[in-house]
Amino acid sequence: MSSNGSDLGHNNRRNEKGNPDSVHSSMRGSMSSTRRKSINFQNQLQLALESNECDVMYCSLSSGRFRAPNGENFPPHGGKLKLSPLEKYDDANRGVPPPSPAPNSDCFATCVANQLPSQSCSVGSAKPETSVMQKHGMAGNGMVGSGMSGNGMAANGTNYHQRGVSPNSRYRLERYRESQSTPQSKLMDNMGGMPSAVPSVSATRLLLPSNVPLPLAQCENYNAYLGSTVHTPVKRYVPTPPPAMELYSDLSISSSPAANLPTPAAAVASSASTSASAMQSQYANMPYNYRSKCCHSEASHGSLSRTSQTYASCSPACTSPSPAPSTSMSMVFSAASSCSPIMTATSSARSGNHRGDDSDSVIVVPPGGGAMAQIEAENPSGTCLHCNTVRRTTGVHQTTQTTGPISPVPISLPVPMAMPVMSGLNEQMPSQSLESSMVSVQAKRLEGGGNMAVPPGSNQHQLYRSQMASNPRLQHIHHQTQQHQSLQVLPQPQNHHLSCKKRIGMYMRRTTSQFFGVEPSTEAADCALWQGRHRRLAIRCFGMFDTELEYHMQQAIGGGNEDAGQSNGTNGNYAPDRPDILPVQDAIGMDMTMSGDSRRQKCYTNRDFLAGEFVERKASVGYMFVAMVSYLVHMFNKRRPIQMHRVRCPWQWSRSFAPIHVQSHSNQQTDADGCLTDGLEAIIDDEVFFDSPCEITTSAVNDESSDIGRQAAKPRPCADQSGVGVSVYMAERQQNGWRTSALNSGGNATSDINLTGDQSSHQPGAAHIPLCSSVSSQMQPAMRSSHSTTSTCNRGNRITAQLLDGVLENSRRPPLRCIKYFSVNDLDDRTDHRPFFTYWINTVQVVVLILSIICYGIAPIGIGSEQKTGQVLVTSLSLQTVQHVEQRNLWIGPRNIDLVHMGAKFAACMRRDIKITEVVTKTRRHERETACCIRNDDSGCVQSSQAECSIRGLYPTKSISTWKKWSPSESGPGGRISGSVCGLDPKFCDAPASIAPYEWPDDITKWPICRKTNSFTQRYRYKDHTSEHMVCEVIGHPCCTGLYGECRITTREYCDFIKGYFHEEASLCSQISCLNNVCGMFPFISVETPDQLYRLLTSLCMHAGILHLAITLIFQHLFLADLERLIGTVRTAIVYIMSGFAGNLTSAILVPHRPEVGPSASLSGVVASLIALLVWMHWKYLHKPHIALFKLLLLCSVLVGIGTLPYQLNFLGLLAGVICGCLLTMSLVPFTTFSKYGRKKKINLIWTCVLFHVVVYTAMIVTFYIHPSEFHSISFVDMFSNSNGYDNFTNADHHGVDVVSSNTRYSQTQNSQYYYHHHSDDIIRKSVTFTEKALVSHILYPTAPRKTSAQQWQEVEYSRSFNHLSNYSDRIKKSIGNISKLKQVFTSPIRFSNKNNHSNLMTELTSVHSENKQKYLGYINNNTEFNVL
């Protein structure tokens, strides 16, 4: 700062003496330099436009007002042009040159010593309006001169140019050196008495006319920022002179008045002087992309070179004639007075990942019509200023540049010019080193020492022709230029615009290859990335790595990641973007000691953290939820308001600089003799909140480990350390002193925990010694035990820990007893995937279960069945005690029929089942024989068979009810004999009407549901006896019950009691589809054909109960999340869904009649995926792989055991999920094969697995739909029938009913409605022959006559139950003797017929009871056939 101030004042005094007109400019530059010391200061370019002075950029601007582009007016002598503000800290005046591999030719003075005599700028009366195009902010040094924008110009026409300071140098504090000042007397002696001009703070700018377009986009590169005092070796500079050849190709000249800018390949400089007429000028940014490779005569450089130079000092004058073998170009424009030409230069682009702001070039171009161009070829003898600067710094001639950006405009693209331009430069490849070109444009020396004064009205073409006529070489150059431009357009490759279809195809191919990991362009980087992910998965799930094998894997991953990090081209350091965080001591090899049970070692690290900026760990979903709940609790709990501020995120920092144990990784090479950056000793000495590295003595270590400990304690260079670091815990502190014992032994490897090591090896195969492998695993416990007693740290005892905690209370440090770790868990999210699919599937499963419990309730809890009894109104218009059986649910969830209704896996709802179809067909055949049973007292009617209508507890007479059946003698409408139907008649239905050709058939099972009935029945209610079935009140309607769509006609009360689906709009069971009601979901496309194949997927989101869901969530949180962190969301979803699909499809084929829910097959596929990765990827790298395999196999056995419980998937489905998950993992995960990896092998494996899955799934679907009965002979149901709780009945068995009368006390039996009601036993049973237990439920017991005494009726003991409950087994055993005799009676069909129709015959069937020999009377209707099935 002192040097800057001294230089500033000295320059002001020099300027005041040399040029009195520039005093005002120097004072304003001084104030501007002082103001720019602030951090967020916005540089302003002040333009002093006086009537009697010649500014640098405007040679003939008259006095007056300066008008900005936005219309903002400025007073004279005080106009300001605002530039874009600096976004970063500006310390340009501090004189701290940063280190850089770029050429050390940045802060040099560029001047052109012209032999032209000085001439003052003429002053015109016009007031030109100059439009200025504002671009990047100027990174300046020194003073800001009035009206200066890149070049300082003295009165004698000599121009000065000084390179701007790099913005990134403001954050490089590695080197602090005193700035050196150069005596101004020596400078003036060298300059020959030329008055100095104040240098500007930015680069040269181009001043163009308003009609000239600006096609160029500014190219970012790293501008001048390194002074000559910093002796930094230049990379990749060849100390050989360049070949003697022409460095520039031909010049292309165009006379078009509408001029464009030259290409970025050649930076063109020109000098301009404005005419008397007020013409507008314009700024344009000239990117620094090329520098001329020139090295010619060095004779005349001499004393003009400067030995030392600082940021605050002025730039000296230095002559730089054009190269001898090349051609220089001078442009002289006509004006009232001329100014000296301006020379522009560009700096080499900085290599690496650091970015820099561009310094803008300014070139003065006069308006068209008032300027004349002149070109000449010279062979001067001079020196190369650029090469001389490099030689002065490094002693090596620079021929190439390390790296640099490519011009945004193609070099070979011809651009029309209004002035001569440099063209024909060879196009550079992106990977090659580029050299920024420096074009020196000089004015032609006037003959006789005078200036060339061209009249304003002269013609440019005439002057150009005269110049060409006098110079033959210029004619040859012009001819070659025109020929080159004509030939340049023809062979130029055209950019073919691909069609949208081709672009989409290319994108899909590239995306697919990247998804499978077989993209050749990114194979190396992807391999290193996946290797790191595999290691982290192995440590999380499988255990620790073996020490030696881990070292080799670390080296392989390190090299790949280094290459990948270097290819990104982004700045990996947080310092340039975070000015509040200072670079800190490199903590490689430093250890951290902790005590207690919270010690945790994980010998791995993440290279992305080392190569990139420090990004702290993302908060998990669970933590955010807990934090939200905790915040709400503390908000409503006002009892502890003081501790409210402690509820904070434990991984946020509010420090202005990071502690010393946080590593700052740099892309630059580190010196081999030390790891500390220069200038940070003061920060480390003043560190009070964190311990400095402590020394450890190895004398207390055991004898067998002393050598190892001493060897590990030796200091190692930072560049050679690629050790494996472990977690650093922030909250574990020892409260013995006022410093926290965070760090110990900067270079020792004998402490508890090592920080993350630097792995910035520049070669993938470089051998480095990891920290964790320098000490054997056997000797580490002994060294840890002795470390707590032998380590000595510098601690103070003046400030207590409690007081320190109070001081640090405002900082966002972790709370006590909360571990914060950097290098392990914080870095997993850098390259690993977030388990979004795990979060999503868990959320869906929880929501589905909650909604199912809310809508359907919870079934009886337990194993087995439960009986429910109640009194309901039945079709006989009497109260009956109905017993209903329900299956219990072990998992605390809905019933099985509700699960099927919500989308459980159930084969009957997915395809047409043969057995269900047979039972439905049988039911419809019996329904054709039914008719309307009308009560004679007009109490109602119901559709029933003749037996049910005649036998209702009384003798078969017509006094109670009439069974109205159409016959040939008494036919229905249209001669129909099928019917009648209660409440349904084609004659009285208007919609749909029975008219030709849509007449209703003579089959009541094919009649539709009538949506509209006419009023004929009410008018002729007592006159027309044929409409009695239409005027009666219909008591019973179809009710769908059971799991297989059983239908019976009953009352609404009874249907609600058994939780069935009541259809009041229908009259017959054939009019509805009970299976469609039971299955739910989307209706069938065809009513008779189930097609809900999507149940194979919907069942994955369903659970049988709360316990089932808890088990699933635990599995998915522990294993599915880890797998998703490795392979990503899409691959995890494919493995999860396809494994579940395969398992459910296999179970549906083998066990079709059992509802199953849950993702058991998917979990099996996930576990199988982990097993495959363990066996084929991590087996030889793990320390104890057998233990990890045993744990995973134990989990598989747990899943198989869960599959034996009710509502769970069969074990064959689990096996299918295991096979599918294993194959999908090997095909989807990149760089995973069964043998040594190869790209062609991987592609073949992918195709093999994909084709295998397609073939297997197709075969299984064909088997499931086309040949569903192939596996019916395999009794998979009976295999686990006892454990699953499924026996030979379902919840549809509710037969035993007791008729209760309030007048008389008696009981009687009602016949089962088996004629049109099929039972679940018929579907599940494998054979036609009934067991003795099943026979009881299907025997039609004869009805006993009324007894005179209720006591006598109660003495009769026989089975009156039609169910199979266990509490009725004693009654069945007592009546086993009667059942054996009943078998003999009903073994053959019995037909009773009578000539007299409508007459009843009574047949007495006697059977002797073992106790009371009671007689049983059976009343069987005539014309009725009874078969014992």
Swiss-Prot record:
Its main location: endoplasmic reticulum. GO terms for biological process: negative regulation of epidermal growth factor receptor signaling pathway; positive regulation of circadian sleep/wake cycle, wakefulness; protein transport; regulation of epidermal growth factor receptor signaling pathway; regulation of protein secretion. The chain crosses the membrane at residues 844-864, 1100-1120, 1132-1152, 1157-1177, 1187-1207, 1211-1231, 1246-1266. Gene3D superfamilies: Rhomboid-like. Residues 1-843, 1121-1131, 1178-1186, 1232-1245 are cytoplasmic. Residues 22-33 have a biased composition (Low complexity). Residues 865-1099, 1153-1156, 1208-1210, 1267-1429 are lumenal. It is found in: Endoplasmic reticulum membrane. Residues 1-36, 560-579, 740-766 are annotated as: Disordered. Disruption phenotype: Flies display a severe decrease in daytime activity pattern and an increase in sleeping periods. It is a multi-pass membrane protein. One of its GO terms (cellular component) is endoplasmic reticulum. The keyword Transmembrane applies. The keyword Protein transport applies. Rhomboid protease-like protein which has no protease activity but regulates the secretion of several ligands of the epidermal growth factor receptor. Indirectly activates the epidermal growth factor receptor signaling pathway and may thereby regulate sleep, cell survival, proliferation and migration. Belongs to the peptidase S54 family. This is Inactive rhomboid protein 1. It comes from Drosophila melanogaster.
